[in-house]
C-alpha cells in the first residue's frame, strides 16, 4: 500500500531507535496531528516485570493534574442516605442500588466509570457479566470501590486514569489531548510515571521503567528520553 504524504512526513521525522526529549517528542506528535478531531496523546510504558507472575502485575490509578480533556459519566452504587447524597453532590450522573442494577441489566450502560461503596458490592457482584467485559467492574485497586464515593467521583471527573500491565508488561494510558499545552502533558506524564514507580513490585529486578513512548491517536510512536523528565 502506498504511503500518504502524512505517513512519509512522520517516518522522516522519527529516527528509529532514537529517544527524544519530551518537548521534542510532543512537537513531533503535534506536527503530525492532521485528523479532523482533537487527537488524544497516549503513552506506552514498558516495565521491567514478568507479567506472567501474579506478584509482578502492576495495576492502579492516577489522577492527572491537568485532566484528560474528556467528559466522564459516572454511576455510583451506594445505599440511600449520606453516601448517595455525597456522590450526587460530586456530580455523579446516576446513584442507586438494586434500581440502578436493574437498569444496567436492561442495557443502560452509558457510563465511563462505575463506583461502589463497600457495602454496595453485594449488589454490584451480581453484575460481573455485565460490567466485567466493559472494564466497568468496581475494584479497590483502582479506587472505584471506596467508602468515600464523593471523593471517588471527583477523582474520576477531574482526570483519573486507570492502568494495568498487559501480557507484555506494558502499561497503556491517555495523558491528554493534542491541544493541551506542553507543560500540561508533561505534568500528566510525570504524575503517571511517579505512581508507576511507587507501584513497583518488590520482586521486580533490573531496570523498571524500560521504555516510555508517546503517540497521538493517528500519529507515530516516539520514544521519550527519561532524563528529560523529573522523576524524583
From Swiss-Prot:
Taxonomy, superkingdom: Bacteria
CDD domains hit by this protein: Ribosomal_L1
MF terms in GO: rRNA binding; structural constituent of ribosome; tRNA binding
Example of a GO cellular component annotation carried by this entry: cytosolic large ribosomal subunit
Family matches, as InterPro entries: Ribosom_uL1_bac-type (IPR005878), Ribosomal_uL1 (IPR002143), Ribosomal_uL1-like (IPR023674), Ribosomal_uL1/biogenesis (IPR028364), Ribosomal_uL1_3-a/b-sand (IPR016095), Ribosomal_uL1_CS (IPR023673)
Record's keyword terms, sorted: Repressor, Ribonucleoprotein, Ribosomal protein, RNA-binding, rRNA-binding, Translation regulation, tRNA-binding
Keyword rRNA-binding assigned: yes
UniProt keyword rRNA-binding present: yes
A Pfam family assignment: Ribosomal_L1
Gene Ontology biological-process entries: regulation of translation; translation
PROSITE patterns: RIBOSOMAL_L1
Family label: Belongs to the universal ribosomal protein uL1 family.
Subunit structure as annotated in this protein's UniProt entry: Part of the 50S ribosomal subunit.
Role this protein plays: Binds directly to 23S rRNA. The L1 stalk is quite mobile in the ribosome, and is involved in E site tRNA release.
Protein name: Large ribosomal subunit protein uL1
Organism of derivation: Stenotrophomonas maltophilia (strain K279a)
Species classification: Bacteria, Pseudomonadati, Pseudomonadota, Gammaproteobacteria, Lysobacterales
Amino acid at each position: 500500500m502506498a504511503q500518504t504524504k502524512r505517513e512519509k512526513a512522520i517516518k522522516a521525522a522519527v529516527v528509529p531507535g532514537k529517544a527524544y526529549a519530551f518537548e521534542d517528542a510532543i512537537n513531533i506528535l503535534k506536527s503530525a496531528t492532521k485528523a479532523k478531531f482533537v487527537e488524544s496523546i497516549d503513552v506506552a510504558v514498558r516495565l521491567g516485570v514478568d507479567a506472567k507472575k501474579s506478584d509482578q502485575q502492576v495495576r492502579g490509578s492516577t489522577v492527572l493534574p491537568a485532566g484528560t480533556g474528556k467528559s466522564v459519566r459516572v454511576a455510583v452504587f451506594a445505599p440511600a442516605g449520606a453516601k448517595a447524597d455525597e456522590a450526587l453532590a460530586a456530580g455523579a450522573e446516576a446513584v442507586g442500588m438494586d434500581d440502578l442494577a436493574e437498569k444496567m441489566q436492561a442495557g443502560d450502560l452509558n457510563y465511563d466509570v462505575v463506583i461502589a461503596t463497600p457495602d454496595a458490592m453485594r449488589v454490584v457482584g451480581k453484575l460481573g457479566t455485565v460490567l466485567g467485559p466493559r472494564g466497568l467492574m468496581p475494584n479497590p485497586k483502582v479506587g472505584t470501590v471506596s467508602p468515600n464515593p464523593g471523593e471517588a467521583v471527583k477523582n474520576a471527573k477531574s482526570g483519573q486514569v486507570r492502568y494495568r500491565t498487559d501480557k507484555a508488561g506494558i502499561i497503556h494510558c491517555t495523558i491528554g489531548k493534542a491541544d493541551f499545552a506542553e507543560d500540561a502533558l508533561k505534568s500528566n506524564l510525570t504524575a503517571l510515571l511517579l505512581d508507576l514507580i511507587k507501584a513497583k513490585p518488590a520482586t521486580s529486578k533490573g531496570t523498571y521503567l524500560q521504555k516510555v513512548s508517546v503517540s497521538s491517536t493517528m500519529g507515530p510512536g516516539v520514544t521519550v528520553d527519561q532524563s528529560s523528565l523529573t522523576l524524583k
